[in-house]
Structures are given as C-alpha cells and as structure tokens.
C-alpha cells in the first residue's frame, strides 16, 4: 500500500488515544522487500525505516512475526482483518501464515474477516479453529463499529 499522507494526522490521534488508555498498537519493525513480487529470489528482510526506494514491502519480517505471534498467544480475543503481506505469492506468505497459525493455536475467541485472510486460513486448514470466519472484511469491521449494513437493514 502507498503511504496516505492525509491520514498521518488521524493516525497520530489514534496513537495518542490508545496510549492514553494504555493500549499498545503493534507496528511493523522489519519487512520482507523486493523490487517486484515476481522477483522473490531477491527478497530480503530490512528495518522498515531502511526500505530502499526501488523496493516494496511484500510481507512482515521475522522480528515482527515473532513479536506479533507472542502477543497473539497472550490475547483473550482477536479480530483479524487483512493479510500481513502479499500472501498469494508463497515467498511472501510467511507473515500471514504465522499469524493464522498463532491465532488458531491461541485459544482466544477469534474472528477472521476479509477474502485474502480467509483464503489463507482455508488453505492452511485452520478455518475450524476460528470462532467466526467472514469474507466480508470491511463490512465485518463496519458491523463491529455499530454501523447498519444495507443487506442487514433490508431484512428488518
């Protein structure tokens, strides 16, 4: 994804609100990068602040995987929406696969949403280890926000 500079102010506000409530926001420390998704042979792991201009982030790196999976193991409930990287390319699926496995093994109440995340969970044979699986990623998040979904509204 490209950096959306217009979102930086909102991101700072969310980070400040989270800090005020004692909530940790986990961010990527390192990334698996390559100049093109088709060039997986040249992929390397670098700190996120050191991604070369001619490279793109295609997955989370090993330090980030370790930190995310450690925190997942301690969670009581988890909502996951969206893959960690370009998981449809095997060379860039490690982060998504590790998160899926960690959630499945965590024992936490777990929800996975979004087509790519659900596809990864299904391909790993882990769907039955999640409490709720929905291909509606954005819609799932809107429902959790309390928004009325058009398809649900018409029912009632």
Where are the regions that the model predicts?
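Active-site loop-to-helix "anion-binding N-cap" substructures in soluble metabolic enzymes
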Residues: 1-156
